[in-house]
A protein has these predicted regions:
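Beta-rich strand-turn-strand
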Residues: 51-67, 72-76
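Flexible, glycine/small-residue-enriched loop-and-beta-strand segment within the central core
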Residues: 1-60, 87-97
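Extended alpha-helical regions
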Residues: 70, 83, 90-92
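Short-chain dehydrogenase/reductase
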Residues: 49, 67, 83-85
Length: 97
């Protein structure tokens, strides 16, 4: 729909999704699939590692030499030479028998 560009030597884990568009939703009287799309470029630099299950949304530039950890949702641009990861707290609870 718009443009997706991937630099040299960039690698992707399983199930990475890249979206260069999104649905418009401005008119409550129309179904969402009748309202068209908003488009935007996605540019991924060279020598990047994009982990499994990462989602990259429109209007994003990922610089060179970037590592993105598994499961991240990238909704804003990432400068070169950066590491991005999800810092979620993992809660483990034991069953009471």
């Amino acid at each position: 729909m718009s443009e997706i560009s991937i630099g040299d030597n960039s690698q992707f884990g399983e199930s990475v999704k890249i979206y260069d568009h999104n649905h418009q939703y401005r008119n409550l009287n129309l179904l969402i699939n009748q309202q068209g799309y908003v488009k935007g470029k996605v540019i991924i630099g060279s020598n990047c590692w994009i982990g499994s299950n990462v989602v990259i949304l429109k209007d994003v530039v990922i610089g060179d030499n970037v590592v993105i950890g598994a499961g991240c949702v990238i909704f804003k641009s990432i400068p070169s030479n950066s590491i991005v990861y999800n810092n979620q707290n993992l809660t483990v609870t034991k069953y009471k028998v």
